[in-house]
A protein has these predicted regions:
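Conserved helicase motor core of SF1/SF2 NTP-dependent helicases
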Residues: 1-73, 77-166
């Protein structure tokens, strides 16, 4: 099961036309793109046909129990604390969950806490939960991306040092 929150990056596009599938497709498109790249279009389609693969918006997870499933929550930095708790409490028997997110790319409204940051703080001592942090050395996209990440990290560090002096 693949899921992610429906949060836009910066600009708000407003209401989208069409039925439910057409409305949520733009938010889930990155998951489809990654699957097609990894498995190929035909294998992905066959996995959907066999119900071996499911992509669902995070908003539709409430009330579910995901037993014997491998669940990936992508872009978790854009969950609210309430959404994160709701997601974490969907994990059923025999299930494993992987939560990914980049806390330097939070697109939530100003003043809204990230569920990923809060979950890491709350769950850091809970047995059976591990946290892994990656750096620019782990970037698998174009080599330029690692340098971009480093430049933004350096600029952020410099800005924080400047705020500390104020």
């Amino acid at each position: 099961v693949l899921t992610r929150p429906a949060v836009e990056a910066g600009e708000r596009l407003g209401f989208l036309p069409g039925d439910l599938v057409q409305k949520i497709d733009p938010y889930l498109r990155p998951l489809y793109d990654a699957l097609y790249e990894l498995m190929g279009f035909e294998k992905v389609q066959k996995a959907f046909e066999r119900s071996a693969l499911e992509i669902a918006p995070l908003a539709f997870m409430r009330g579910r129990t995901l037993n014997n499933a491998f669940i990936i929550l992508d872009e978790a930095q854009n969950t609210t604390p309430e959404q994160m708790k709701m997601f974490l409490t969907r994990i059923g028997f025999g299930a494993k969950a992987v939560i990914t997110g980049d806390v330097s790319q939070i697109d939530l409204p100003k003043g809204q806490s990230s569920g990923l940051i809060e979950a890491e703080r709350i769950l850091k001592r809970v047995q059976g939960i591990a946290h892994v942090r990656f750096s620019s050395a782990d970037v698998v996209r174009h080599p330029l991306i690692a340098r971009i990440v480093d430049a933004y990290d350096a600029a952020g560090s410099a800005a924080r040092r400047g705020q500390d002096r104020a």
